[in-house]
Amino acid sequence: MAEQELRNYHLNFGPQHPAAHGVLRLVLELDGEVVERVDPHIGLLHRGTEKLIEYKTYLQATPYFDRLDYVAPMNQEHAFVLAAERLLGLEVPRRAQFIRVLYSEIGRILAHLLNVTTQAMDVGALTPPLWGFEEREKLMIFYERASGARLHANYFRTGGVHRDLPPKLLEDIYNFCDPCSQVLDDLEGLITDNRIFKQRNVDIGVVSQEEALEWGFSGVMVRGSGMAWDLRRAQPYEVYSELDFDIPVGKNGDCYDRYLCRMEEMRQSLRIMKQCIELMPGGPVHVLDGKVVPPSRSEMKRSMEALIHHFKLYTEGYHVPAGEVYAAVEAPKGEFGVYLVSDGGNKPYKCKIRAPGYAHLQAMDHLCKGHMLADVSAILGSIDIVFGEVDR
């Protein structure tokens, strides 16, 4: 009898796969149904963001950050404006800092709600996304009332925020917090103890603390493994050092623990939002330096100097002192960092973006090895990939 050669099966997962969360292409090598190798192919959404920013003024560069992790846009803007402010040596007014923290936490809930519910959908639960998106819709309206846009807000500016919040908005956000907490309880009742959900996520994609550090993980990917590392506590920025909140950590570092961390983080975000509204001071929402922040419309109607400032800011932009700085924020997906180099001109010399999802996706081979084919989508769902920031 002739000898038969056994070969592994190669399978393309994506780029149009419903569980791929965007334009991901994975080339899987399977032995039967067991995954032997995972080869992620990225770059299908590459738009050259870092290079484009080098040809734009600092004011024009901010909207590019909305388009990275487009699930929680303001968190990305935050890192860029922090970097520019450190180079300029600006002190942001306290009201602006509280507004930024408030909207960063709204962004965290937006991202986690999407992730938790789609993670459940990836393993077969169809109801959670319908409940989660109802709450996301309310948060999108808060985005819209502050900035005029539901998604690409362009609200954080160097020196503060674009404009003050409209009346009654803070009251509406405060009234949203308690009912939202109830919705989170309902969601947990639906999936936390669900037998099928646990079978699909417990002990799947386990990451130890050492592995998390070696792969450069951040955010929920390290906290799920038991490390209480959160930049809001470790390197406090804005007013986080004044706020009271807990950092949820997991024990086993598997998909299920990461899900539980995200659920608890949303509750902590609601706590932070309520504190921000209770402690919100009065005063200006951006620095009063006319060389950096455009004047108000009413001022431009009265003052020729204000009109000149406005014209200069929107044509030439402001010049940033030469130097380099790295600013990182705790984005929903992990440590989102911006390494900004200025040569003293009105455009960044170099802007390197450190996207958390990039480090997480590179470990797909390590995470999936030895698991079943069906577990690939569960692992992918739990590492929370958005392709805007991975490919940028």
From Swiss-Prot:
Tell me what reaction this enzyme catalyses.
a quinone + NADH + 5 H(+)(in) = a quinol + NAD(+) + 4 H(+)(out)
> According to its UniProt record, where is this protein mainly located?
membrane
The record's Gene Ontology cellular component field reads: plasma membrane
Pfam families of this UniProt entry?
Complex1_49kDa
Q: Which domain of life is it from?
A: Bacteria
Q: Provide the protein's localization.
A: Cell inner membrane
Return the EC number: 7.1.1.-
* Oligomeric form and interacting partners: NDH-1 is composed of 14 different subunits. Subunits NuoB, C, D, E, F, and G constitute the peripheral sector of the complex.
- The protein's name is NADH-quinone oxidoreductase subunit D
State the organism of origin.
Parvibaculum lavamentivorans (strain DS-1 / DSM 13023 / NCIMB 13966)
